[in-house]
């Protein structure tokens, strides 16, 4: 992250051959692009990333070799998520209408100059899609055993609860803010998102 060994360039060449107009979007040190082929109907976007996490130990094949053995492709990023992006390109070549791809080089790292910045650009240029397919791999036990309909995000919040300090000898004069906070936390935990 964010190096992609030329993966975005390969994609850009392939998408231009399919009639896509490509806009390169560099934010900081991060290369991203938005590719669009306008057409009738709703706007469908495929979103993904070309960066990978460091390979770590224990590889049976070179992590950056892209070896194929018994119909299985071995290499860092083959599943997360260059395989998904290859499926996007295959689908985009067959899907009629208004299709785009949002490709970022900053998903595995800090993720501040990738999708968030490209979405801001898309908003500014009137290119927010009606639908988006994110090809991030998800599974319970075996790749492809589940399909998720959304991606859970995260929320950071500061909750302030007022109390009243007091002496241990006079607990009836004190208000413990933690005790007041517990029902609010229970309500938040019970709320289905």
Language model features: what each stretch is:
Residues 121-193:
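Midchain, well-structured core segments that form catalytic/ion-binding scaffolds
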Residues 81-150:
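Acidic/histidine-rich catalytic neighborhood of metal-dependent amide-processing enzymes
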Residues 20-21, 73-80, 169-177:
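Short alpha-helix boundary/capping segments
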């Amino acid at each position: 992250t964010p190096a992609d060994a030329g993966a975005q360039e390969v994609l850009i060449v392939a998408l231009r051959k399919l009639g896509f107009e490509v806009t390169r979007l560099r934010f900081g040190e991060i290369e991203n692009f938005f590719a669009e082929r306008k057409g009738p109907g709703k706007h469908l976007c495929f979103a993904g990333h070309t960066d990978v996490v460091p390979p770590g130990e224990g590889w049976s094949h070179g992590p950056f070799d892209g070896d194929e053995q018994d119909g299985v492709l071995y290499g860092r990023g083959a599943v997360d998520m260059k395989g998904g992006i290859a499926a996007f390109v295959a689908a985009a070549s067959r899907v009629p209408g208004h299709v785009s791809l949002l490709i970022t080089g900053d998903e595995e790292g800090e993720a501040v100059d990738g999708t968030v910045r490209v979405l801001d650009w898309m908003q500014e240029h009137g290119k927010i899609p009606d639908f988006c397919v994110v090809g991030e791999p998800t599974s319970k036990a075996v790749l492809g055993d589940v399909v998720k309909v959304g991606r859970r995000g995260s929320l950071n919040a500061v909750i302030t609860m007022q109390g009243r300090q007091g002496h241990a000898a006079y607990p009836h004069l004190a208000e413990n803010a933690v005790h007041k906070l517990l029902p609010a936390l229970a309500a938040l935990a019970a709320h289905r998102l």
